[in-house]
Amino acid sequence: MIAIIAEKPSLARNIVAGIGEMKKKNGYFENSEYIVTWAFGHLFSLCDIEDYSPLPSESRKWTLDNLPCFPDKFRFRLKKDDKGKEDDGVKKQFETIKALLNRKDVDKIVNAGDSDREGEIIVRLCVNNALSENKPFYRLWLPDQTPQTVSKALSEMKEEKEYENLANEGFSRTYIDWLYGVNLTRYASIKTGTLLRVGRVIIPIVKAIYDRDLEIENFKPEIYYALVSKAKTNGEVIELTSKYKFSAAEKAKAERCCERMNVFEAVVTDKKSKKEILFPGKLYSLTKLQNFLGKKYKMPMEKSLSIVQKLYENGYVSYPRTNSEYLATNEKDKVKQIISGVKKLGYPVVFKDKKTIFDDSKIESHSALTPTYKIPDKGSLNDDEFTVYSAILRRFVAIFCEEECYIEKSELTISLGGKEDYSIKGSIILTEGWTKYDGGEKKDKMLPKLEKGDKVNVDFHPEEKQTQPPKHYTIETLNNYLKNPFKDDKTSDDNDDEDYKAIFKGLELGTEATRTCIIDNAKKSGYISLKKDVYFIENGGKYLIEQLSDMNISMDKYKTSRLGQALKKVYHGEMTIDESVKMAENEIRQVFETDKNAGSGFYGDVIGKCPKCGKNVARGRYSYACEDFPDKCDFKINLRILGCPVPKEQAAKLLTNGKTDKMNFTSLKTGKVFSSSLKLDESKKVVFDFT
């Protein structure tokens, strides 16, 4: 008997569809050969710091006493619910899995997690915690969830040990993110008195948006003068722009230059045109699909991912969390089958065997997003699902379209007295080809009716212009930045070798599988916002980045990409889990050492007596604190509370009178300014007083 553990119920149902007739039981399916059961995604999570700490387990107060926490061995436990209590559904399903795997008639176990590092460890954790004795262990790897693919994959399963490096990468990622998230979130939150969510990837994402918005805020436009001619020749306005520019103070100089230019004769010195094929874009990776949907339909990333995941689970598209825009050479027969299905929809598609489509060197784990041979019934998709599915289908049709798109490109060269040449380019679509299905609106750009040797009238004059600020990040530009944060914005996308090298080295920030969730968490935490398809930093994000900067906590793209590279080395067997974890621990240790070396020494005069223990209170690095802080006394007043600096005089008044004057604070959630005093409550904590 073969026991298959799927990552989630929907996948289990699709596996059952591929196997054939099975009886539904309580928490699993079964026939004479197979048992198919499932998890609910992660059934296990890493233990909390308190579970490793020598402090009493009943004490759940965050404290610096158990930081930094570097477990000798990471421990997992069954996942709890949102309230931190035992999840009855999780416990029941795991007990079902445990009972099934340990049945005497089960002699083979199959990992049917999603085909990525996360799916790999989700099922491994179930098996590792359930099995009482070892049994043969295999992997079901599904590029899509159609019955035919499931049936084929069941006959081609490899031993689970062949995916050891993938699992190691998954566990390394889990441990490293726990180390950063738990240690630095608690550290920063304790130091500031505000919950700050610090993570390996969320911080560089928020910081990128913070830096860009700060650039825009501080940008001061400068006036300059461009030399522009807009004069009619044969009834058409011919616009020419010189390469020369002049500053605001050089307007007179610009005018004199224009006068000299207008003396010269402008002549068409060359006219050329050529017919060429316009090729479609590549198949979609998840990033490129989200870019398209965000730009055209203003669809947020979490929504597009949720929809494409549902399409995948319904068997309509291939595995969605892919970073490649290419297909594997061993998928050619599968593509021919998809083409047969797409033809029935009336599209003129034919198989094409090209390096621009099939390229194993540009595939890490999963090939590009495509439709499958399973076509959704008319009306079975809602509007948003149809939009996403159509985008994937239309791109596939464009790639394999029988009809080529031919265009005529033309160029005029106009010389101004032999002193400066100007180029005017145009293009005309001769045959639409694939653009009918995936091209959007293509407009002809006609050249002026001029021939070689024709004279062109000119009337150059200085035209006042302003330098432009950087643009806010959009879904597309932020995604592109995260995919390759070291790529020059101006670098052409025509040659994607640089991007794939960056991905394979681990230089990207986050992955296709994680970025959407992390960006969504940043929005939910009030750090950033998305308006239409444009990202903005919020007050909570400003506060986060500025506080981390004050504490010398750096999670820039360089540090994050170094950790990403370490994970790739684990995946390729070039680094062990322990080595990657030690690397992260050293980075985190530096934060605490820097703070320790800076000391809790006081930078200012004593401002009063501690209301808890009676010792002196003075200004420290992050707060006005008791001289016994943090070892013997935990009293402190943060130097800045919700964006408001707490002056020394107000802190002294709080100690003396138990209350400050009214001050203005900024809500991290709404961004609105509110007025309140600060007071000490019964436990001598600093709280707001609106009376």
Provide a role label for each language-model segment.
Residues M1-A3, A112-S115, G193-L195, S273-K282, ...:
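Conserved short loop/turn motifs at secondary-structure junctions
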Residues M1-T174, W178, H461, Q468-P469:
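Intrinsically disordered, low-complexity regulatory segments
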Residues I2, K80-K83, V90, L101, ...:
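Basic, low-complexity terminal or inter-domain segments flanking catalytic cores
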Residues P9-V16, E33-V36, F40, L64, ...:
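Amphipathic alpha-helical transducer elements in NTP-driven molecular machines
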Residues K25-L55, I203-S247, I399-K445, R621-A625, ...:
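Structured, non-catalytic alpha/beta "coupling" segments that mediate domain-domain communication
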Residues T149-S229, K274:
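C-terminal or mid-to-C-terminal helical accessory/interaction module adjacent to the motor/catalytic core
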